[in-house]
From Swiss-Prot:
Gene Ontology terms, MF aspect: cobalt-precorrin-5B C1-methyltransferase activity
EC number in record: 2.1.1.195
Pathway participation: Cofactor biosynthesis; adenosylcobalamin biosynthesis; cob(II)yrinate a,c-diamide from sirohydrochlorin (anaerobic route): step 6/10
Residue runs in coiled coils: none
EC class name: transferase
Protein's UniProt keywords contain Cell inner membrane: no
Protein name per its UniProtKB record: Cobalt-precorrin-5B C(1)-methyltransferase
Reactions catalysed: Co-precorrin-5B + S-adenosyl-L-methionine = Co-precorrin-6A + S-adenosyl-L-homocysteine
One of the GO biological process terms: anaerobic cobalamin biosynthetic process
UniProt organism field: Bradyrhizobium sp. (strain BTAi1 / ATCC BAA-1182)
Length: 376
């Protein structure tokens, strides 16, 4: 599978989701359990009707249980699960009991409400479950076997890999999630990140948290958490997707949301950009110069903004002059965010930080006056 060239003008290889790999492993393990022989290649149906083939990396059978494993290939996507072994163990259940799922080693368990699965369930998402059930049904029809089985999914090393994901924050403990809605990983896709934003908001809402914060990066996230004393569950890894977060909150509101980010990213938001990635637009220093001029900034600061190469230069001159450029940016960013949110039931504020996590600007609402300038 290949994908049209994206950042490097070369074909990017697509990959397979953990859900697809778990389905293939479950199909192979089921065949091994029913026939005593494991296929080298298994073929499964993907959501949408396509089919895909997977090589079986390992298999074993003993004591009425059969296990098979598939190595995940994420293609060119920077996925922490790339190269992981996804294992499925299948064993018979009582007649008429249907298919049950278990979390094996390295697969997490849901502990908080707000996710697509209730607390206590293995973190095998609904679409992968449907895929596995369909694969078992297909194999059972072909082989004349039972549909009453337990399917346990395991990922060796998954508990350590999960520390690099949002699972701990979402209340998924013990390992990774089995994910996927299409069965296919698209390299550098925005969809997975935006989906994680939605899940973070859902968990915060289910927990009844009155205040959440979406941050553009780790520095601003740590800073806004310290500023407001927020629990980890209240922190949304917004990244560049300010618009995605705010539009979701429009339909799924919380009591209060803080949008937090660095000076340059919040300048982009102030300009009117809701996608803060460089591909969507650069910092418009001409816009910033005009905004500072209109706010009564000293001529030296305005001229710096007009001639600067980076937003950092403007922030440094703001420090020297004592004029709160960060507050000007925060106010403009608040206006953009307010229009995107479009829900007065949600209190909105913006916090702007420098690269050291120092608060350099803030807007608590439409009528908020600039703060006195913080100095080192």
């Amino acid at each position: 599978m290949t994908e049209t060239a994206d950042p490097l003008n070369r074909p990017l290889k697509r990959g397979w989701t953990t859900g697809s790999c778990a389905t293939a492993a479950a199909r192979a393990a089921y065949e091994l359990l029913m026939t005593g022989s494991c296929p080298a290649i298994v073929d499964i149906a993907l959501p949408g009707g396509r089919r895909a083939s997977f090589a079986v990396a390992i298999h074993e059978a003993e004591g009425g249980r059969a296990t098979a494993g598939v190595v995940k290939d994420a293609g060119d996507d920077p996925d922490v699960t790339h190269g992981a072994l996804i294992k499925a163990t299948v064993q018979r259940r009582d007649a008429g009991s249907g298919i049950a799922f278990r979390a094996g080693s390295g697969v997490g368990t849901v502990t908080r409400p707000g996710l697509p699965l209730p607390p206590g369930e293995p973190a095998i998402n609904p679409v992968p479950r449907e895929m596995i059930i369909a694969a078992i049904d297909e194999a059972a029809t072909a082989l004349g076997g039972t549909r009453d089985v337990t399917v346990e999914i395991a990922i060796p090393g998954g508990e350590d890999l999960a520390k690099k994901t949002l699972n701990p924050r979402l209340g998924i403990v013990g390992g990774l999630s089995i994910l996927g809605t299409t069965g296919i990983v698209v390299p550098f896709s925005c969809a997975a990140w935006i989906h994680s934003i939605y899940r973070g908001i859902d968990v915060a809402r289910a927990a009844g948290l009155p205040h959440i914060a979406g941050a553009t990066g780790s520095t601003s996230e740590k800073a806004v958490q310290q500023l407001y004393g927020l629990p980890d569950t209240a922190l949304i890894d917004m990244g560049d997707f300010a618009g995605g977060m705010l539009k979701y909150l429009r339909r799924h509101p919380v009591g209060r949301v803080t949008v937090a980010g660095g000076f340059a990213k919040m300048t982009k938001l102030g300009q009117g950009l809701l996608d803060l990635h460089s591909r969507a637009g650069e910092v418009d220093l001409g816009w910033l110069a005009t905004a500072l001029h209109d706010a009564g900034a000293p001529p030296e600061l305005v001229e710096t903004a007009r001639t600067a190469n980076t937003a950092l230069q403007v922030l440094q001159e703001s420090d020297r002059s004592g004029f709160p450029a960060g507050d000007v940016v925060a106010r403009a960013a608040w206006q953009t965010a307010y229009r995107a949110l479009a829900n007065d039931a949600v209190a909105l504020d913006v916090a702007v930080f420098d690269r050291d996590g120092r608060l350099v600007g803030r807007c608590l609402g439409a009528d908020h006056s600039p703060l006195p300038r913080n100095r080192r």
